[in-house]
């Protein structure tokens, strides 16, 4: 391609030089004719036409030739016997011919002028035509020259693109070779090994699943009947734990209480050590062994394990995870002035508490409405003031005082919406006196380790065992308990 373009370019250049040489020859010849006209022709000769300044003359219509009679008949020639008259060449002519009969050798100026004029017209036309042809050829040559330069530039660009494409192809080829080598060395050789490992893991998991299924079946069989506490219960009893301590029950363990003679006695855990004792534990969280995400009736009646004897003693000296029951809590708090103590512990062992001098829970007809007052403590007044991290109406939405009790099947919270999915108890993991929604959530889901995130939560909400005024929304307590006792002046 490059050789062909170079040969065509050389050929056009040679043709251009030949045409320019031919034009110069005709111009010189034409100039010589004009010079002779100026030196020898009379005023009757034509004037050269300046095409740039003058218009070409137009031919006028010629009149018809004159008709009619002409000369009379020529006289008869003289006889041959007559004496030949010698003709003498006129002076106007040039040199004489060697034979006198042939006359003048050179023509006169008028004859030469006329002959030249007869030849000048076709030559002039030819010269004009050649000039036009030369100009057209020159323009064509210039266009061809420019086109050839354009082709040359395009060809050079194409050559560069081809070279760049070759480099890209080489790079991709090298990359493909590397990938092919990697596949051959790693994937093809490792896949069989990985498959064997996965088969081994699968078999191991299958055996573990079978063992778990066996354990679950045994546990389900064991839990077909309600769990019973196999430990001794003290003989001393009373209306609540405060009356028991006054009767001499001084150890913290499980007791039987009977607030009213119309109800059967029931088990509670009495804390006889904290702040002079006499506390009836109505709620306790410590290890996540009991699910607090329950319906209205279980919260009404109570659930969980009141106490355990895992310390090796013959009595239940340690509290379990349980909720005493809303009916029982309501009855105990409506017997007289009652105080509430909420204790909590984080996963580092740090402890805080919130004490309320007044605490009352209404009956079921009033949806177990809560009332608290007279706060003191180190945990922060979450029940009365709401979450300290929030401001304005957002904080007001987290106040629990005065709220009704809610479970996921009985929506009594302060989140007023037509969407049944937007329910605090359903999103926050337990039954509680929710507003919209909480600053405290003692009955929430139990998270090991304390810190948890929204993607760990079932609904993406802060549904842990939370007390926002101490640890914020995304920290679930290790332990939390709620204890009540009749209010009396301390000595």
UniProtKB/Swiss-Prot annotation:
Site feature Cleavage, where: 44-45, 152-153, 160-161, 163-164
Segments forming a coiled coil: 157-222
Annotated disulfide bonds: 231-316, 241-270, 424-437
Residue ranges occupied by any Fibrinogen C-terminal domain in the UniProt entry: 232-488
InterPro entries: FIB_ANG-like (IPR037579), Fibrinogen-like_C (IPR036056), Fibrinogen_a/b/g_C_1 (IPR014716), Fibrinogen_a/b/g_C_dom (IPR002181), Fibrinogen_a/b/g_coil_dom (IPR012290), Fibrinogen_CS (IPR020837)
Impact upon substituting residue 196 to C: In CAFBN; fibrinogen Longmont
Biased segments, Basic and acidic residues type: 47-57
Keyword vocabulary terms for this entry: Adaptive immunity, Blood coagulation, Coiled coil, Disease variant, Disulfide bond, Glycoprotein, Hemostasis, Immunity, Innate immunity, Pyrrolidone carboxylic acid, Secreted, Signal
Function: Cleaved by the protease thrombin to yield monomers which, together with fibrinogen alpha (FGA) and fibrinogen gamma (FGG), polymerize to form an insoluble fibrin matrix. Fibrin has a major function in hemostasis as one of the primary components of blood clots. In addition, functions during the early stages of wound repair to stabilize the lesion and guide cell migration during re-epithelialization. Was originally thought to be essential for platelet aggregation, based on in vitro studies using anticoagulated blood.
The name this protein goes by in its record: Fibrinogen beta chain
Gene that this sequence comes from: FGB
């Amino acid at each position: 391609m490059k050789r062909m373009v170079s040969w065509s370019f050389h050929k056009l250049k040679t043709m251009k030089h030949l045409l320019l040489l031919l034009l110069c020859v005709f111009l010189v010849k034409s100039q010589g004719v004009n010079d002779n006209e100026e030196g020898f022709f009379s005023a009757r000769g034509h004037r050269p036409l300046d095409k740039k300044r003058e218009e070409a003359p137009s031919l006028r219509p010629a009149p018809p030739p004159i008709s009619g009679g002409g000369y009379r008949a020529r006289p008869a020639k003289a006889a041959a016997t007559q004496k030949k008259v010698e003709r003498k060449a006129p002076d106007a002519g040039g040199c004489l011919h060697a034979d006198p009969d042939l006359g003048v050798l050179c023509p006169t100026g008028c004859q030469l002028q006329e002959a030249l004029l007869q030849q000048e017209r076709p030559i002039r036309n030819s010269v004009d035509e050649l000039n036009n042809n030369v100009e057209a050829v020159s323009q064509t040559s210039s266009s061809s020259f420019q086109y050839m330069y354009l082709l040359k530039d395009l060809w050079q660009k194409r050559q560069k693109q081809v070279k760049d494409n070759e480099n890209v192809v080489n790079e991709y080829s090298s990359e493909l070779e590397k990938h092919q080598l990697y596949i051959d060395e790693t994937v093809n050789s490792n896949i069989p090994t990985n498959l064997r490992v996965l088969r081994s893991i699968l078999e191991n998991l299958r055996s573990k699943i079978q063992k778990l299924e066996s354990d679950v079946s045994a546990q389900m069989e064991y839990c077909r009947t309600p769990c019973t506490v196999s430990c001794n219960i003290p003989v001393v009893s009373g209306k609540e734990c405060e009356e028991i301590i006054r009767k001499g029950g001084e150890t913290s363990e499980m007791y039987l209480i009977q607030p009213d003679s119309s109800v059967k006695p029931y088990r509670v855990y009495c804390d006889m050590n904290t702040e002079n004792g006499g506390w009836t534990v109505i709620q306790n969280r410590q290890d996540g062994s009991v699910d607090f995400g329950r319906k209205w009736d279980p919260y009404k009646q109570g659930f969980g394990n009141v106490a355990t004897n895992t310390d090796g003693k013959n009595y239940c000296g340690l509290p379990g995870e349980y909720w005493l029951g809303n009916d029982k809590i309501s009855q105990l708090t409506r017997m007289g002035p009652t105080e509430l103590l909420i204790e909590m512990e984080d996963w580092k062992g740090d402890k805080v508490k919130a004490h309320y001098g007044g605490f009352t829970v209404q009956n079921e007809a009033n949806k177990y409405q809560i009332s608290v007052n007279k706060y003191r403590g180190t945990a922060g007044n979450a029940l009365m003031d709401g979450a300290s991290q929030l401001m304005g109406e957002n904080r007001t939405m987290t106040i629990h005082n005065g709220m009704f009790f809610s479970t996921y099947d009985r929506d009594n919270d302060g989140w007023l919406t037509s969407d049944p999915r937007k329910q605090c108890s359903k999103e926050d993991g337990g039954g509680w006196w929710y507003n919209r929604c909480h600053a405290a959530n003692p009955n929430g889901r139990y998270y090991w380790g304390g810190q948890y995130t929204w993607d760990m939560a079932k609904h993406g909400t802060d549904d842990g065992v939370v007390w926002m005024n101490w640890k914020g929304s995304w920290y679930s307590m290790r332990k939390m308990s709620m204890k009540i006792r009749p209010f009396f002046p301390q000595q």
